[in-house]
Amino acid sequence: MKLTRLAIAALLALAPMAHASDLISFWDTPQHGGNSFNQAVPDEAYFRALKATGATWVRLTPSKWKGAGRDFLIGDADHYTGIPPSDLATLITCLDAAQAAGIKVVLVPLSLPGDRWSQQNGDKQDDRLWNDKAYWDQSAAFWHDLALALKDHPALAGYNLINEPTPEKGMDLDEHADAATRQAWYAKYKGTTHDLPAFYEQVIAAVRSVDPTTPVMVDGGWYANAWSFSYWPTKLSDDKVLYAFHMYEPYEATSSPNLKRDPQLRYPGATSWLAGQNVTWDKTVVADYLAKPFEWAAAHGVPNNRMVDAEFGCVRQWVDCGAYLNDVLDTLNAHHAHWAFYGFREDGWDAMDYELAPSVTQGQFYYLQEQGKADQLKRTPHPLMDVIEAHMK
């Protein structure tokens, strides 16, 4: 059902109206937070628990929540016609809970029209958004409607327009290519449906037509690869943009399949293919790798306080997860960057719940979740969370 302006106005009455005149100032100093990718709608207790870690913000996706249609908020990613009012009401209730807990929210959808999240699409890549600009128009319409509905909510600190876009996928660009290769690729595809900066310009214009103040966060391409901004010839035209990247490299070591290796890939010491050569990962390589987005920012007049590592992490049962987290966080804090760890008390996946005690097995996690006894999960000691909290101070 299409959300009319009258319906939006009625729902806005549910949200507090006090709103900062210039929200970008929140991001003038380093902000540290966590990701919320839960299937259940987080409540105030959840946000208070996150705030207790030292977090000041949460990167929140509502895309896993059950909605009125197939795709929460969008209704149907095959054809967007308006935000279902009941979905919007649920989201506003969640934002109210975050506000009550004193934590700021950046909203991020996992799906857009023509780009349904693969885990809700039979594990199949949906790349219609990057092949048909009709879906650009629908995505802009969606964000116009959402910004119109939420622009005055005091919990909001930003709109992250899409999580981990992949306009380069299947288009002859290696995910780990060097800057020159990426730039040559973009020169070929600039102005096409694979032009991510142009897509963002269109969507931001739609947002700004109704909301001139809420910051916009944009992920780089290739799943927000930290090197993806290297092909952007300029920063975006809007002056309230945060540029986001994610950090899971070397993925072969930080991800779940490594737990099945005997022996596990270690850190430092794991190797991977990067920019045409095999590298051995240690703190120096982490620092060099993460320097790339900041080098791009400096070259294009973007200050470090507009750069965000919006996701990073490693599976908690990896023997070297703590050492890896420490080196990533040392590097990010040296740049005075914003960051958000992945993830906080995710209810459908235990692998990056750093509060869980090392003794908690995957089987115990899923059993207690299924029995509705998640509150019985042992959350101390939590040496990995200690690493994260130490870097928040």
Predicted regions and their residues:
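Gram-negative bacterial Sec-dependent N-terminal signal peptides
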Residues: 2-19
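Active-site mouth of glycoside hydrolases
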Residues: 21-215, 220-230, 240, 348, ...
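A non-catalytic, amphipathic alpha-helix used as a structural packing/dimerization or gating element
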Residues: 53, 138-141, 288, 292, ...
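Short beta-strand segments enriched in hydrophobic/aromatic residues
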Residues: 62-64, 109, 247, 314, ...
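Short, hinge-like loop/turn segments at secondary-structure boundaries
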Residues: 76-77, 123-126, 176-177, 233-237, ...
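Glycoside hydrolase catalytic-domain groove-lining segments
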Residues: 193-198, 202-205, 213-217, 221-315, ...
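Aromatic-rich peripheral "rim/lid" segments of glycoside hydrolase catalytic domains that contact
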Residues: 319-393
